Amino acid sequence: MHIEVANNNGTKYLRLAHCRRGTNRKGVRTIVKQIVLNIGPLSRFDDGKPDYLGRLRASFRDGRPLIDALKPYVGDAPKAKTTVTFVEGDATCIGSPRRLADVILDPVFEALGLDELFASVKHDSKIRYDLTGIVRLLTYGRLLDPASKSATMAQNGKYLRPLVGSANDDSVYDALDVIDRSAAKIFRRMNTKIAQGIGRSPKVVFYDVTNFFFEIPRPDEDVADESGDVVERGLRKMGVSKENRRQPIVQLGLFLDDNGIPISFGTFPGNTLDHHTLRPAMKATVDTLALARFLLVADRGMYSGTNMCHVLDAGNGYIVSKSLRKSSRAEVAWALEADGYDKPGADFRCKSRIVTRKVRDEGGRERTIREKVVVYWSRAFYERERRENESFLSFVERLRANPAGFRITAAQSKSLRRFVKGDVLDKKTGKILDGTKLVAMIDDEKLKAFNDLFGYYQIVTSELEMPDREVIDKYHGLTRIEDQFREMKSTLETRPVYVRTREHVNAHLMICFIALTMMRLIQRKTRQALGPDFGKGLDWTYGIPGARIAETLREWQANELPGGHYQMLNASDGDIATLFRAFGVDVRARLYTKGDIRDLKSSVSPF
């Protein structure tokens, strides 16, 4: 027996039903459903807490139903017996398991409004191929088994019910063009559905930039008009790779809400500086989504007067780190001064002040803004910086002790240039002269200033009244977006290996964005199912790691048996049991039909 929801004139009713194999009026063997008990309207019993229906089903399954009227039926369901006959030569004699991941993924995809969106795009564009099916297949494939677009299309037959109805696999490349053109619609639809389903949490919006490298022989060329003026910059350009690769890259800027759910992203040529991505990304996405006022939290690479003016002019605020090593001497001196710190001598101490800065906005006009500057010193941060620079500082001391005994490598030469008093380079070769001449040129004041800033960090904010520790805590939430990038580069294997054109690169990244958002929504449900003690003591947690969710959904399969029966595989315990509990899916130890599996999908509570 199972609990189901029936809709009667707009009112949802709970009822207890029992399904069994039987014979209908025409004498055909089929599934017969019997309504055992009409429980009553859902609104009468719903306690207002998250996922009431899932908890009710779980309580009935565990023998402790939340509704007293169900107690007489606990454990009374008759045990169905099914006879399966294998006939030699029947294909079902040899197992051929198919994926069931779409039982959970389809409701999440639909909850984001993407099925309706792509159906509308298909209708308006008079597309003949299965656009929605292709987007689903590409997205689910990116979650479960990342591969090229062609290889992902070949995965269609791995699902119990194929996701794509059209047979022409080449349509996937046409679909990529459509996805690229629909980017703004996708962002708006997903944001609207998330806001309606779980409530978008835009009080804090995180932003950061990563990049992806391409193994191609040369960067993309710019497109110029007849006058030689650049009308479109090439996308795959040489830049500073996050993975230290000397190959063309594409920049990606990602926005994230305070729940850890992605909001939108923007792509930029690889030679675009990080702080030049913020304003275009905001204008193209978050500025158009009608979000309530939020605090933009970003790393020091995003800080510039022009960027901060744009954030303020849009009615928002900001919390952004600012490099102390690139600050003025007066700012550094104030940070190092012991006066003003809340806990002098402690392993973590901070202080703040309000300053007035003159900056220029996007139009070049001079503006005056007031900011709160928060500086803190952390012993943990100090130890980390000291370890990171230990090898170089040790080299400098050994160089002092024995200058004639060193040959300076190219890497050491680059590091040393920051700490020399004058020009000690060979103008013809560009190399540093021998160690005996170099050691006398080391600027001890610069070296001391470098060491003095170990452990210090500076944050600026528009929120003049916000307590210092709250500013620091909100800034530290930026680690969530770093986890998004790790998930994209590992579990989702986002690096665009098999796409070439700008449109297809953008579409590929959009598929990865949708997959990442779905992953976070699934993890959010698992975190709720794991209870309040899960992750206790951590600053934050997404629940079950993304790689484990992908593996669990990939391995949840069904094997076809004679007579239209299906045996579920890898569906009993561990992470899959947590997923079932999280989404209110009641999977029992029995054989299933395709109708039963459809019922499981309809019972999923995506938000």
What are these model-predicted stretches?
Residues 3-5, 11-14, 105, 112-607:
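Anion-binding and metal-coordination hotspots
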Residues 1-132:
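Conserved glycine(s) in the ABC-transporter nucleotide-binding domain "signature"
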